[in-house]
Amino acid sequence: MEKIYERKFFRFFCGFLSFSFLIIFWELSDNQGNNPVTQVLPPPSQFLPVLFESDFKIGLGSQSATIYQSISITLIRVLSGMSLAFVGSIIIGLLLSLSKWSELFFVPILSVIAPIAPIAWVPIALVIFGIGNLTAIFIVFMGVFFTLTIATIAEIKRVPTNYIFTAANLGGSKFKIWKSVIIPSILPGVFTLLRLNFIAAWMAVLAAEMTGLRDGLGTVVMTGRNLFNSNLILLGICIIGITGFAVDRILLFIQNKFFWWSTN
């Protein structure tokens, strides 16, 4: 019998309940007179009306954009960078695994570059690409690609040898073994790591938007800072959190739907 805490509805209800208690506590704390916390972090009843009063637009003059545009711009940047990193890491990982010498020479380089924080690439990206979408996409790519490439090589080593021997005994060529055995075996693990790295990629693109770009969700927060508008800052932070959570759920759905053969 399935335990109650393993049921999807119960898990959803607990999450919804925890957020409800948080919002209620947040709102009630604003009624405690001169509360220094709510002066810096105004409750939702104060910063949410900002969205409706501005007709869902953020910014000044020609720099203003609707909140939908800000969300879509940021999503395009982070998903483009992650897609390029995912495909590139699979290709490079497969190529390096074809030769032990290539692995010996190049994996140490990947291992040195992988721990570098994505935000550290911002100055270089601005010099190379200037202010634009390519800067954000490059930063996301650099923050994810090297980790995924190392993971691809590790996943290839974990492919059970009996799978490969069985395919070879059945007359499978090297190409068919790679196509039908090795690649399907490594895809679930690499995609799982891609999903886990989404948080780092999400933070990287937001940091890029805050430091050098003129649009996106990160710019919403910076606009609030420049205007000394804590309501706008909190609004941007909440939208960032909700959007990031939604994308993570979508990636989890893709993982369960399209990589169903994974045993993990």
Where are these regions (language model features)?
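Transmembrane-helix boundary motif in ABC transporter permease subunits
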Residues: S80-L110
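Short cytoplasmic-facing helical segments at TM-TM junctions of multi-pass membrane proteins
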Residues: A151-L193, L217
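Transmembrane alpha-helical segments of polytopic membrane transport and secretion proteins
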Residues: M1-S20, R249-N264
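Alpha-helical membrane-interface segments at transmembrane helix boundaries
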Residues: Y68-S80, E103, L110-I113, G130, ...
